[in-house]
Design a protein with these regions (language model features):
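Extreme N-terminal leader/anchor segments
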Residues: 1-112
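Aromatic-lined, polymer-binding surfaces characteristic
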Residues: 71-72, 81-85, 99-237
Length: 237
């Protein structure tokens, strides 16, 4: 396996800085997933990456929820690559594993209460903010854009099972200005598909984010920097 992705036959007329075309991005996504899937052997294996001692989480003696967070972050971040590939080619496979089948199964396990790999619910954890909220935002950003990749392939019974976890995290407390985007995205997904949400909470998050517009397309990140409007558009499309 190549140690780095190479842009072959670049088109600098189309993309002056990188030379990358749409096909290059498709090939790069496959390359990255091929690397990621070296860490699983079958469709039943949760995706995780090797830890870097002292640098990555979880640390020794961390509670179980930290391991679920590790798995969910790997699953969501790689689905950001897999989703568009499934959208382009529903039959796409990596390492002999059909991506739609893998992500459908693993997300169902993660979001169904009671499964050994299911995420904890907010009420089962100390009252705080958690990485789960961030990953929900990323996941449902992709599913708002491309629901046909996996969401529409679940049965109504499966969806209703998963919505319990989705809704509880969508309504859970958040932090900082930009993190509200994650709640906004997840709440918006639920609302779009007819599930009950707290509309006033969604409105509150939206107004809060809008109040931090600082001009010329920049939004203040409450504690330390600014986010460009492009990020907000990407996450709220």
């Amino acid at each position: 396996m190549k140690r780095a992705f190479n842009v072959e036959n670049p088109d600098f007329k189309l993309s002056p800085l990188t030379g990358m075309t749409r096909q290059h991005y498709i090939e790069m996504a496959k390359y990255l997933l091929e690397r990621a899937f070296t860490h699983i052997d079958s469709i039943n294996d949760p995706l995780t990456f090797p830890p870097v001692p002292g640098k990555t989480y979880p640390q020794p003696d961390d509670p179980d929820w930290r391991y679920r967070s590790l798995e969910f972050e790997a699953l969501e971040r790689t689905f950001t690559l897999a989703g568009p590939l499934i959208h382009v080619d529903p039959e796409v496979e990596i390492k002999g594993i059909k991506l739609r089948d893998y992500y459908s199964l693993q997300l169902y396990h993660a979001l169904t209460p009671g499964h050994p790999n299911s995420l904890p619910l907010p009420e089962d954890l100390p009252d705080s903010t958690y990485q789960f909220t961030c990953e929900f935002g990323g996941l449902f950003k992709t599913l708002l854009l491309m629901p046909e990749t996996i969401w529409t392939h679940y049965t109504e019974e499966q969806k209703n099972e998963m919505v319990v976890t989705i809704s509880k995290w969508a309504h859970h407390r958040t932090t900082q200005n930009n993190w509200r985007i994650f709640n906004i995205v997840t709440l918006s997904f639920l609302k779009k598909y007819g599930y009950e949400i707290d509309d006033e909470l969604l409105k509150s998050h939206l107004l809060w984010v809008a109040s931090y517009h600082s001009g010329n397309g920049w939004y203040l990140e409450q504690t330390y920097n600014y986010y460009s409007i492009s990020l907000f558009i990407v996450y709220t499309t």
